[in-house]
């Protein structure tokens, strides 16, 4: 994982600690967010900030994990374009992203990276019947979808879907991967994205009645 990603994350967290820009936005959005998310009654904005920090900081670890697993199972050449693209979301963001900096801008990029990895993970399950990542980011990604706002998040989803479709056509690679001994190893236990936050500060989706 390029050191530039970690440096970008550190800089954004440092800027947020000085400006509180994202915290102020969340305070304004709180009434709308509470319609979609189950937040702790005590300090809900602090819980959201902890969740966002964990979500953003988990990107380098996820990229590193996909790199290691794909190399071990012999399909790194297949995964590499996705990994490079996820890195580029941080280092060379696409034009669809607004030029806002700080932690708010980084959340946009982290959402793109995590959603792209989710697409790769789904494809891995389809072909090998086990997940690539030991962390299920599905719920976390839906939560961030709500934090970004439906209209903007949907545009980012469409970008990821279009990009993934361009890269997921090389099905012949999976025939080779399925024949590798490593693909028959016991699957790594999958933990849910709620582990991104402290147990006392869980953010959950509010299910429609």
Positions of predicted regions on the chain:
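Membrane-inserting effector segments that mediate pore formation, membrane fusion
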Residues: 81, 85-113
């Amino acid at each position: 994982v390029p050191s530039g990603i970690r440096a970008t994350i550190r800089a954004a967290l440092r800027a947020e600690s000085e400006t509180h820009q994202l915290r102020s936005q969340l305070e304004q959005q709180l009434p709308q967010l509470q319609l979609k998310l189950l937040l702790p009654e005590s300090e809900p904005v602090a819980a959201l900030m902890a969740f966002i920090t964990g979500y953003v900081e988990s990107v380098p670890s996820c990229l590193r994990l996909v790199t290691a697993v794909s190399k071990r199972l012999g399909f790194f050449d297949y995964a590499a374009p996705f990994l490079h693209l996820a890195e580029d979301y941080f280092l060379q963001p696409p034009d669809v992203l607004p030029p806002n900096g700080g932690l708010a801008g980084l959340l946009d990029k982290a959402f793109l990276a995590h959603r792209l990895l989710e697409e790769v993970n789904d494809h891995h399950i389809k072909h090998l019947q086990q997940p690539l990542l030991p962390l299920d980011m599905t719920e976390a990604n839906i939560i961030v979808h709500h934090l970004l706002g439906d209209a903007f998040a949907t545009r980012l989803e469409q970008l990821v879907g279009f990009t993934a479709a361009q890269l997921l056509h090389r099905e012949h690679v999976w025939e080779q991967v399925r024949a590798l001994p490593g693909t028959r190893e016991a699957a790594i236990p999958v933990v849910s994205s709620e582990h991104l936050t402290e147990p006392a500060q869980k953010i959950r989706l509010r299910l429609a009645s």
